[in-house]
């Protein structure tokens, strides 16, 4: 299903009046708007190319020669409404400078198994000027440093989306039934204890990911506006990826592909580990004690009979 939809999603559109991102970024407000749109566009690309929701749940926007599908409110599809509320919750936490990381996770066992199929991680960091956003669908990236001009920011954004599209095309199709959730992690020092964005509740701060088979970690991209930056990563089982390395390296940029666990935050200063028993991916280390972070999570969304 995802492959079939791809041909509709990536189309050449030479004369476009509607654009995805602002043409100029000169202050923090414009930068925040850019990061929000890049985040929402990334989530939309993932859900569309993985075939999670019907065509009616998407509108169309344009980015250079790409015709993108962007999630919109579709009352006939409750699942898409849930995702939009999650995105809006992330926006609120971003505006308040609370959000450290948003993790979108896909499971394929509706009976309650916690075995992960795919994970997309978005990290956010805040500088004196503003925030930085890392999108980790577990890889790395084309990097443009803070303070670069608008053209460089646009190039980095377009390349990130293109590489995300390539990655989605190279993943095996999902089964008919999928369970979706998103966890939000915060900066404890600035986030009120009782803070919860709309659509979220207090969550469990777990650093373990359980895969059936060995996972692969792919850093897709990094974009910096001078006020905010975004990094993109993806994690899935290595056996589910089709010719990923060859296709990503066609994009004249650096792409890191590694068999490893989640990236540790700089604050945590600990190493990644994969425990071979059941391929449990963990960010925890016996040599690294970490403070318990505040986490929010929504009700999981079950998406049945996608075909």
From Swiss-Prot:
The lineage of its organism: Eukaryota, Metazoa, Chordata, Craniata, Vertebrata. Pfam families: HORMA. The keyword Repeat does not apply. Gene3D superfamilies: HORMA domain. It comes from Homo sapiens. InterPro entries: HORMA_dom, HORMA_dom_sf, HORMA_MeioticProgression. Phosphorylated in a SPO11-dependent manner. One of its GO terms (cellular component) is cytosol. GO terms for biological process: meiotic cell cycle; meiotic sister chromatid cohesion. This is HORMA domain-containing protein 2. The keyword Phosphoprotein applies. Highly expressed in testis (at protein level). Expressed in lung adenocarcinoma and squamous cell carcinoma (at protein level). Expressed at lower levels in the liver, brain and kidney. Keywords: Chromosome, Meiosis, Nucleus, Phosphoprotein. Essential for synapsis surveillance during meiotic prophase via the recruitment of ATR activity. Plays a key role in the male mid-pachytene checkpoint and the female meiotic prophase checkpoint: required for efficient build-up of ATR activity on unsynapsed chromosome regions, a process believed to form the basis of meiotic silencing of unsynapsed chromatin (MSUC) and meiotic prophase quality control in both sexes. Required for the DNA double-strand break-independent, BRCA1-dependent activation of ATR on the sex chromosomes that is essential for normal sex body formation. It is found in: Nucleus; Chromosome. Interacts with HORMAD1. Residues 29-234 form the HORMA domain. SUPFAM superfamilies: The spindle assembly checkpoint protein mad2.
């Amino acid at each position: 299903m995802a492959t079939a939809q791809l041909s509709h999603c990536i189309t050449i559109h030479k004369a476009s009046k509607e654009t995805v991102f602002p043409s100029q970024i000169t202050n923090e407000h414009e930068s925040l708007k850019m990061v929000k749109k890049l985040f929402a566009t990334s989530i939309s690309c993932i859900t569309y190319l993985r075939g999670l929701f019907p065509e009616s749940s998407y509108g169309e926007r344009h980015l250079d020669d790409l015709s993108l599908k962007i999630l919109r409110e579709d009352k006939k599809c409750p699942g898409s409404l849930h995702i939009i509320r999650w995105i809006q919750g992330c926006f609120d936490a971003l505006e308040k400078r609370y959000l450290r990381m948003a993790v979108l996770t896909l499971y394929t066992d509706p009976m309650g198994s916690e075995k992960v199929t795919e994970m997309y991680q978005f990290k956010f960091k805040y500088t004196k000027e503003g925030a930085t956003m890392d999108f980790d669908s577990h890889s790395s990236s084309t990097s443009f440093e803070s303070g670069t001009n608008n053209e460089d920011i646009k190039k980095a954004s377009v390349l990130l989306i293109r590489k995300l599209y390539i990655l989605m095309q190279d993943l095996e199709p999902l089964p008919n039934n999928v369970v979706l959730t998103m966890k939000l992690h915060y900066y404890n020092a600035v986030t009120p204890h009782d803070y919860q964005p709309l659509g979220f509740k207090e969550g469990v701060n777990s650093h373990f990911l359980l895969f059936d088979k060995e996972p692969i970690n792919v850093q897709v991209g990094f974009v910096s506006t001078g006020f905010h930056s975004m990094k993109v990563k993806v994690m899935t089982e290595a056996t589910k990826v089709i010719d990923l390395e060859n296709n990503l390296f066609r994009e004249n940029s650096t792409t890191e592909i590694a068999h490893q666990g989640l990236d540790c935050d700089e604050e945590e200063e600990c190493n990644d580990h994969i425990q071979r028993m059941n391929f449990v991916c963990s960010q925890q280390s016996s040599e690294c004690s970490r403070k318990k972070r505040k986490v929010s999570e929504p009700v999981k969304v079950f998406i049945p009979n996608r075909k």
